[in-house]
Amino acid sequence: AFSNSITTWFWFAPQISRAVSDYNFTHTAIINAMWQVPGPRDGIGKAVLGGWELGGIFKRNSGVPTTPLIAGDPMGVQNSGSDTFGIPDLIPGCDPINHNYKNTPGLIYIKTSCYTVPMATPAIASQCVAFSAVPGSCSNLLGNAGRNSIVGPPLTNFDFSMHKNIPVRKISESANVQFRAEFFNVLNHPNFGPPLPFTGATNAIIFNGDGSAAGSPAGGLQQPLVTLPRDIQFALKLIW
């Protein structure tokens, strides 16, 4: 299973588990290029400015999905471990994603205010068991916020390289020593995973088991980053 997976959904309501897969990337773009830099053909200029290559790989893809949940076992299915949870209601017309999350303390990505616990209607009130913290609610009712209904932040990464080829004709006509400078995530762009419902991090838990609002880090992005900070390495390579 993936870290954003929920291992077992409600067997009696299979329709609520119908969604994009846990590893879905709706859009992915990868652009790579290698350029042999033009330089002088002879003399000192060739020795210093000749033989350079510049390369880069740019990647941009959509985020992976995640699922907002209610903690505990409000449905009373009495499964063990991570198989116990409830589904909240999404308020119609409310965008659950905080698009300004980078400027929000705690990197809050999910607008928890866009969700409520399922509420009892007159038609079903007699069959409902209320959350202890929310009178008039219905803990044994599934909400409308479906599986993988929130898409996490996109991933952006750019790797850059510089190569200097130095011919070594004493070895062979094609031999050269290549100096390599490689910069991974050269822009040092932070890429976060989505708020996760389980695997020890409960950022996608919107409400506690009693129906009260979950505190920090509810709605916050996952740590650590899904890509490493800028990494630079140098190498010499003999090619013949």
Predicted regions, residues:
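Short, solvent-exposed micro-motifs at the edges of structured domains
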Residues: A1-W240
